[in-house]
Amino acid sequence: MAGVEQAASFGGHLNGDLDPDDREEGTSSTAEEAAKKKRRKKKKGKGAVSAVQQELDKESGALVDEVAKQLESQALEEKERDDDDEDGDGDADGATGKKKKKKKKKRGPKVQTDPPSVPICDLYPNGVFPKGQECEYPPTQDGRTAAWRTTSEEKKALDQASEEIWNDFREAAEAHRQVRKYVMSWIKPGMTMIEICEKLEDCSRKLIKENGLNAGLAFPTGCSLNNCAAHYTPNAGDTTVLQYDDICKIDFGTHISGRIIDCAFTVTFNPKYDILLTAVKDATNTGIKCAGIDVRLCDVGEAIQEVMESYEVEIDGKTYQVKPIRNLNGHSIGPYRIHAGKTVPIVKGGEATRMEEGEVYAIETFGSTGKGVVHDDMECSHYMKNFDVGHVPIRLPRTKHLLNVINENFGTLAFCRRWLDRLGESKYLMALKNLCDLGIVDPYPPLCDIKGSYTAQFEHTILLRPTCKEVVSRGDDY
């Protein structure tokens, strides 16, 4: 409506000419209106621009925030990836196959695996191995104490001078401890004796890090059963199986640079033998307690017998006094020499020879429900080159070859037929017999008490150090 009325009022001027004054007024008014319109447009334009600018500012602010957040999260992801890469071994970088450089993590000390496979020398990289049980020497016969040895500067210096030797014994002893702990975790009735010995020896070789004559097994694994007291290990083809009622003596040795650990224990499954084992263990510990510098060997034997015979054991309704096996004994140990000359009796009436400073002894006792005497029996499996033998001329080529094999692999340490088989030797029995006949090699057949009797054994290696006595093979087990 308003638009129609406005058009009507201007009707006269639209078709006719305007007066000059009217034209000037019209021109000026139209110019003013045009200027006003321009100003309004500018204002509108400015308002629109400022609104757009504000909108853009808002959007750009949000965008900056979003970008900042993305960068932050990306940085976190990269950090996590780097951490993961440090833990891992580093994967190939896509198709290029390039490996990223990783920061090496510091490795902690090695720990033993299960089953044991890490050599003892790798578990103790500083080369210092765990000591055995250190004991004060027993008082002398006139009642004087030996405590002064532990504080004497002279004795300390002497002890330190032989530290390398003691350390070799300790390394071999730690291997022995770990192997026997492993054996006790799996030995059970139903296993063949060959299976038991080979599993034990394989583990022992790994832990001692077998290296020719520098480190390895000191003698074959004895696994004598029941009335057999010592020196039995199965030959190839032996089908003997361990039974629930068997009493098995596990006697094995390790060495580092010829420093031998000779240590043994008895395994049973039937508790009826418990007292027999207690008697023999007690007798061995008594022998260890009595041993010392300037102690007479016969006095050690007498103390052992007294303790052993104080025990009675009932087996299958029969009562037996536990008897020490009088023709078996402990012995001194030398470098690469399991029996170094001195014997430690386990009954009274032995030699009056004295133990000396710096010597190493295997203190072992055997208890029996039989006669208390052993004899050679069964097929021989243990052999050892005679330590004192000189040059003996050998004519037969096979015998010469076998002696070379023995010299290279065992030297003067004991060995068994299984170990010759393992080296690839065959048809060697005649050559071995020839070496025995010539006195170059000595056979050590199994030693047995009467049939139907039961025998037990415990043994430790002791070091007669200048300052103290160290039961180097002592463990938590015995």
From Swiss-Prot:
Residues bound to a divalent metal cation 2: 262, 331, 364, 459
GO CC annotations, alphabetized: cytoplasm; cytosol; plasma membrane
Protein name: Methionine aminopeptidase 2
Keyword hit for Hydrolase: yes
Record keywords, A-Z: Acetylation, Aminopeptidase, Cytoplasm, Glycoprotein, Hydrolase, Metal-binding, Phosphoprotein, Protease
Sugar-modified residues: 60
Family stated for the protein in its record: Belongs to the peptidase M24A family. Methionine aminopeptidase eukaryotic type 2 subfamily.
Binding site for substrate: 231, 339
Sections of the chain in a coiled coil: none
Entry's cofactor comment: Binds 2 divalent metal cations per subunit. Has a high-affinity and a low affinity metal-binding site. The true nature of the physiological cofactor is under debate. The enzyme is active with cobalt, zinc, manganese or divalent iron ions. Most likely, methionine aminopeptidases function as mononuclear Fe(2+)-metalloproteases under physiological conditions, and the catalytically relevant metal-binding site has been assigned to the histidine-containing high-affinity site.
Chain intervals with Basic residues compositional bias: 36-46, 97-109
Pfam families given in the database record: Peptidase_M24
UniProt region (Disordered), positions on chain: 1-122
Modified residues (N-acetylalanine): 2
Modification Phosphoserine, positions: 60
Amino-acid positions noted as binding a divalent metal cation 1 in the UniProt annotation, renumbered to this chain: 251, 262, 459
